[in-house]
């Protein structure tokens, strides 16, 4: 069995998954806005505490972490929606948890999961979009994830749709994500 961790802009979800992709157990926590150091500490403590708890209950072979933004094999290069940059999460967790830990962009993880176990498994090619705190995406060609290296994937949320548009947290102007969020906020009011 494996532990999957979804580190979102507003929550952390930790689940135990069997070899068929079935979620056996799931734990969730909402994240509150805080400064970077507090967020990092909160994330680490929550993951370590719950991973250890789940490892006592199940035989866990590895842990996978899905996070929005740009990541490499062991750290978050930049996650705009979480306010994280150069965060060595894998190194920090490995000192407390003795199983292999992998990290990948959340949209890529979701696309792989849907292509393997979910609604996309009967398709050879697909474009997968994630809509949450931000907007992300991934492309599947011939049942394989389009490799974008350490780049985030198809982060359409940070593609500029208006040259001199609204300033985004990423530092650019006119990001698609800002306009979708504004539309969503208008509907809520």
Where do the PLM segments sit?
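A structural motif specific to WD40 beta-propellers
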Residues: 24-26, 77
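Short, acidic Gly/Pro/Ser/Thr-rich loop/turn segments
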Residues: 12, 70-72, 136
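Conserved Rossmann-like nucleotide-cofactor binding loop
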Residues: 10, 22
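Glycine-rich phosphate-binding loop and adjoining helix at the ATP-binding site
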Residues: 31-48, 52, 58-63, 70-125
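Glycine/GP-enriched mid-protein hinge/lid loop-to-helix segment characteristic of carbohydrate kinases
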Residues: 15-18, 26-28, 36-40, 102, ...
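Active-site flanking residues adjacent to catalytic metal/cofactor-binding acidic residues
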Residues: 5, 105, 149
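Short acidic/glycine-rich beta-turn/loop cap or linker motifs at sensory/regulatory domain boundaries
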Residues: 18-20, 72
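Short glycine-aspartate micro-motif
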Residues: 2-6, 60-64, 126-130, 169
């Amino acid at each position: 069995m494996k532990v999957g961790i979804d580190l979102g802009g507003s929550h952390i979800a930790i689940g135990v998954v069997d070899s068929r992709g079935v979620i056996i157990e799931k734990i969730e926590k909402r994240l509150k806005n805080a400064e970077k150091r507090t967020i990092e500490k909160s994330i680490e403590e929550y993951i370590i505490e719950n991973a250890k708890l789940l490892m006592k209950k199940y035989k866990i072979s590895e842990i996978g972490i899905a996070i929005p933004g740009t990541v490499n094999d062991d750290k978050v290069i930049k996650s705009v929606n979480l306010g994280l940059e150069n965060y060595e999460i894998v190194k920090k967790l490995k000192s407390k948890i003795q199983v292999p830990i992998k990290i990948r962009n959340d949209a890529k993880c979701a696309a792989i999961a849907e292509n393997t176990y979910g609604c996309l498994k009967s398709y050879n090619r697909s474009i997968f979009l994630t809509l949450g705190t931000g907007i992300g995406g991934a492309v599947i060609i011939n049942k394989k994830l389009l490799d974008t290296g350490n780049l985030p994937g198809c982060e359409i949320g940070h593609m500029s749709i208006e040259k001199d548009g609204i300033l985004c947290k990423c530092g650019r102007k006119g990001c698609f994500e800002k306009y979708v969020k504004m539309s969503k906020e208008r509907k809520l009011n």
